[in-house]
Amino acid sequence: MSVCGGAPPPAILKEGDLEKRSDSFLQLWKKRRCVLTADGLHLYSDARKRGKAKVLRFDSLAKLECVEWKGERVYFTLVTLGGQEIDFRCRERSRWNAEITLALVGFQNRRAVRELRERKEHQARDNGERLRSWGP
């Protein structure tokens, strides 16, 4: 997690409340105001989004897993590249788990295309070739 201030976040894909399980011994659930963007999940402890957000950046996340439905709530876990697990829950109808999954997969796809493009451009430079445009 990083702390983001100053610059406004990119375009908002979804905004609303999630509950995050604390890392403390008691593991209490704490409500967070959340903003989902194309680059990550911004968590605010204040409902009015005052102060700095903790950001779970998609470049540091491996996957969303362990989705469970209990009553009207959905429980899910975000797993970092380092293996840390961060637990969340939300109302089933809010579809946070689906929205985060779609945004994370979209981010990973864009990164894979960018890395492939860079690798092809590097190979073309090494071979003295010119590469046709792949789009944006």
From Swiss-Prot:
Signal peptide: none annotated. It is a peripheral membrane protein. It comes from the Eukaryota. It is found in: Cytoplasm; Membrane. Residues 12-105 form the PH domain. Transmembrane segments: none annotated. PROSITE patterns: PH_DOMAIN (PS50003). InterPro entries: PH-like_dom_sf, PH_domain, PHLA1/2/3. Pfam families: PH (PF00169). Keywords: Cytoplasm, Membrane. SMART domains: PH (SM00233). SUPFAM superfamilies: PH domain-like (SSF50729). One of its GO terms (biological process) is positive regulation of apoptotic process. GO terms for molecular function: phosphatidylinositol phosphate binding. One of its GO terms (cellular component) is membrane. Belongs to the PHLDA2 family. Plays a role in regulating placenta growth. May act via its PH domain that competes with other PH domain-containing proteins, thereby preventing their binding to membrane lipids. The PH domain binds phosphoinositides with a broad specificity. It may compete with the PH domain of some other proteins, thereby interfering with their binding to phosphatidylinositol 4,5-bisphosphate (PIP2) and phosphatidylinositol 3,4,5-trisphosphate (PIP3). This is Pleckstrin homology-like domain family A member 2. It comes from Xenopus tropicalis (Western clawed frog).
